[in-house]
Amino acid sequence: MQSDKSKALIDSITLSINNLATMTDATVKSALFKDWLRAVSRFHHYSFNNQLLVLLQRPQAERVAGFHTWKSLGRNVKKGAKGIAILAPCVRKQTVEEADILRTGERGSAMRLCGFRVTHVFDIADTEGKPLPELEHRAQAGGDSLLPRLERAAAAMGIVMEYREVTGSKNGWSEGGKVVVNATLSTPAKCGTLAHELAHEYLHWQSNRRDDMTREQRELEAEATSFAVLAHFGVEQPSDRYLASWDATAESITASLHTIRDAVHHILGVMDSECQAETEIEEIAA
């Protein structure tokens, strides 16, 4: 059973998507889309709906967590701080009959989603206590160390990397299992190009979606994904293409936003895993 509070939150999400779809001001539309991408970059572990809810209520939020999670990290929520309302799933055990597994001869029970409840998280600005080393590390990762991390992520995704001097205006391209980046680019430009092409590989080659999409839609998804991946490390690309010229319905926008969110979560997850493995190797060597 859905509560009135959770229904109100879901309605606010639907309204924000509809507003984006019907917006005619290209500049404002692009700015709103980039705001959402920044939210994805900060909260990529959160669901699509909760990312939007955090953005709608606290656009400047940097890192959010529940009251007890902050306490476990050595930080306390400040007195009088206002929480950010998000949705948490309500689950219960279902019977064998409900799961319709009697015919298979199996026994036991499974979990069933029976709705959502409203819970609250707090931004780091609403807390005080021990500093978080992870945020300091993330801030440092935006320099020259970002490119090697992207390269290791490519290898972990099974993608062959090649730097090649390219004539003309192309910065790079993906070939389905291989990415070529213009060797004459600056390090920041290499980062942007590599992140963009990794997005193409994951979104369009590895998923076999490439032939079912227009070139414009493929470029939109790849550019948006790379923007969010780099923004996670404090690097922003100077691009305003995004949704500004994208004529789409609320349904198609929602589908693409879900896809972009999943791609960002996957690529950042690979980068985090590779960074952790690298740290463990350094500790062993020391």
Residue ranges and their predicted role:
Residues M1-A286:
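N-terminal accessory/interface modules of nucleic-acid-binding and processing proteins
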